């Protein structure tokens, strides 16, 4: 299979370029390389032609990928073994250098003073002459570790050549002896290759065995949050102890080779190949078997499955659709459910998602309830609008409760104990202003206790949501308490709120302002937090 491609190649700058031939000179010639790192040269179009293996099906392509993965596993094991050996040597050198610094070089007692004036005894390893040569040997070991890091980077780059890793402008080095370990017939340079498939690095690290092939139903698009957190935690611990210069972890490079190597150096003892994932310091989470859904934790149904049911039901060629005027147990709606189940199973044959029949049927019934609600709202538009408004206010109360709870940890223990029994029903109703579009009018519930009301005002004064310019306070809401709210303690629920309103009449209570116009605050204790500006038209 012949191919021809034109690639826009942007050579890296002097600060980013780093290959095996200059890895050892990067520390000594740091000043020279730094002076050359100016503006990067413009992109140069490169035309590449060649021939390669003709793949007839996806199975053959996966077979080629699996062969390359097996080869990459072997290279990774070799690099890991060399890294462990260098780690043991590095630790022994550090111990000996520490003894030399402290003047605690072990001298046999029988020779005593005769050995004090003679040359020091020969020791195994690089420390034979003086501490100066020991430091030179230590730097040589560090350079050798850098070369091992380049070897590991070759493994990652080989996966990128296959399209198994995402492209990223990371500093990758390639030894001269390993430059020809790419795909046969491929003449692209390392920085010129473009990915073909989705990344497999996260799942590749998660494999247990040495030659266990990667059978992934769904390709991960990026490193899992647990993996990124583990890399961030592991990298600062390795730098001060080993004395090596560690590059910062870059999640967009899909497993930085240098960070992985330095994390592997933490494991000094020999281990089997099954310990690769543990020695790399990665906490790999499995692929999300439900796709990119579950954005909202409160969502009961899977988002991917719900969208699939919606698309199948509303397809232009589909005549079997739910009848909202009938029950779910009607013969027509039952036939629609059976039809949707058959279509969903056909759609999910090649899908990596493994849904049970119960989940499929539940998604169909949930969509029927949606169509049923739409039908009822069409019969009574005012009732539908009212339910929609109530749902919007309830959603805003949940969000307000979450915002206030997130900053409650900054308050005292007494306020935290009071907040433990608070529910979303005690939050204010953030209604849309009828006079000013885009303005929310926060109307506190009438049955909320005064102490909790003051605490809510202080929470709003210290939160980003509460101090928004488009959020103002209004009169108490007309919402009545539920049966659950009436069981709350008196510190949260005021059982005499109706009597107090009747006694107050038209006069405002002391300390509470009038609600003729929406205003920013109605608590006098907030004068130190919020600037009050009231404008009245005569």
Swiss-Prot record:
MF terms (GO), sorted A to Z: RNA binding
InterPro entries from the UniProt entry: DUF4616
Q: Keyword annotations for this protein?
A: Isopeptide bond, Phosphoprotein, Secreted, Signal, Ubl conjugation
Q: Where is this cross-link: Glycyl lysine isopeptide (Lys-Gly) (interchain with G-Cter in SUMO2)?
A: 128, 221
Q: One GO CC annotation, please?
A: extracellular region
The source's domain of life comes to: Eukaryota
- Which residue positions does the secretion signal occupy? 1-17
* The keyword Magnesium appears for this protein: no
Compartment(s) where it occurs, according to its Swiss-Prot or TrEMBL record: Secreted
Chief subcellular location:
secreted
**A Pfam family:** DUF4616
Q: Where is this region: Disordered?
A: 101-131, 233-253, 488-523
Query: Which residues, renumbered to this chain, carry the PTM Phosphoserine?
Result: 224, 285, 428
Name of protein? Uncharacterized protein C14orf93
């Amino acid at each position: 299979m012949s191919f021809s491609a034109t690639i826009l190649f942007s050579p890296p700058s002097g600060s980013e370029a780093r290959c095996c031939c200059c890895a050892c000179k990067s520390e000594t010639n740091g000043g020279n390389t730094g002076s050359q790192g100016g503006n990067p040269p413009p992109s140069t179009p490169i035309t590449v032609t060649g021939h390669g293996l003709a793949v007839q099906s996806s199975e053959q392509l996966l077979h080629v990928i699996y062969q390359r993965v097996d080869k990459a596993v072997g290279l990774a094991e070799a690099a890991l073994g060399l890294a462990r050996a260098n780690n043991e040597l590095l630790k022994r050198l550090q111990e000996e250098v520490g003894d030399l610094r402290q003047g605690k070089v072990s001298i046999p007692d029988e020779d005593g003073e005769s050995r004090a004036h003679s040359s020091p005894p020969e020791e195994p390893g690089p420390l034979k002459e003086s501490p100066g040569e020991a430091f030179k040997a230590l730097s040589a070991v560090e350079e050798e570790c850098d070369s091992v890091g380049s070897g590991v980077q070759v493994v990652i780059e080989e996966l990128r050549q296959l399209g198994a890793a995402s492209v990223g402008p990371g500093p990758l080095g390639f030894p001269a002896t390993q430059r020809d370990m790419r795909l046969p017939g491929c003449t692209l340079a390392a920085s010129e290759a473009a990915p073909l498939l989705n990344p497999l690095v996260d799942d590749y690290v998660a494999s247990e065995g040495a030659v266990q092939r990667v059978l992934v139903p769904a390709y991960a698009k990026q490193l899992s949050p647990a993996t990124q957190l583990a890399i961030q935690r592991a990298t600062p611990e390795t730098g001060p102890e080993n004395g090596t210069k560690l590059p910062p972890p870059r999640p967009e490079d899909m497993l930085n080779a240098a960070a992985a190597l330095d994390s592997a150096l933490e494991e000094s003892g020999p281990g089997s190949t099954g310990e690769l994932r543990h020695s790399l310091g990665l906490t790999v989470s499995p692929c999300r078997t439900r796709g990119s859904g579950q954005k909202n934790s409160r969502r009961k149904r899977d988002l991917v499955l719900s969208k699939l049911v919606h698309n199948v039901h509303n397809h232009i060629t589909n005549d079997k659709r739910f009848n909202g005027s009938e029950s779910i147990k009607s013969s027509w709606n039952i036939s629609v459910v059976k039809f949707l189940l058959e279509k969903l199973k056909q759609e999910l044959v090649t899908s990596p998602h493994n849904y049970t029949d119960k989940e499929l049927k539940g998604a169909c019934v949930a969509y029927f309830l949606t169509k049923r609600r739409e039908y009822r709202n069409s019969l009574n538009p005012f009732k539908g609008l009212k339910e929609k408004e109530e749902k919007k206010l309830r959603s805003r109360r949940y969000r307000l409760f979450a915002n206030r709870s997130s900053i409650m940890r900054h308050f005292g223990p007494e306020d935290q104990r009071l907040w433990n029994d608070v529910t979303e029903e005690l939050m204010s109703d953030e209604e849309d202003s009828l006079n000013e579009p885009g303005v929310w009018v926060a109307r506190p519930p009438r049955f909320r206790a005064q102490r909790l009301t003051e605490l809510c005002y202080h929470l709003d004064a210290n939160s980003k949501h509460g101090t928004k310019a488009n959020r103002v306070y209004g009169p108490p809401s007309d919402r009545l308490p539920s049966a659950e709210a009436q069981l709350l303690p008196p510190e949260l629920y005021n059982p005499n709120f109706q009597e107090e309103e009747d006694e107050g009449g038209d006069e405002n209570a002391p300390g509470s302002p009038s609600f003729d116009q929406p205003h920013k605050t109605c608590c006098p204790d907030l004068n130190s937090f919020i600037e009050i500006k009231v404008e009245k038209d005569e």
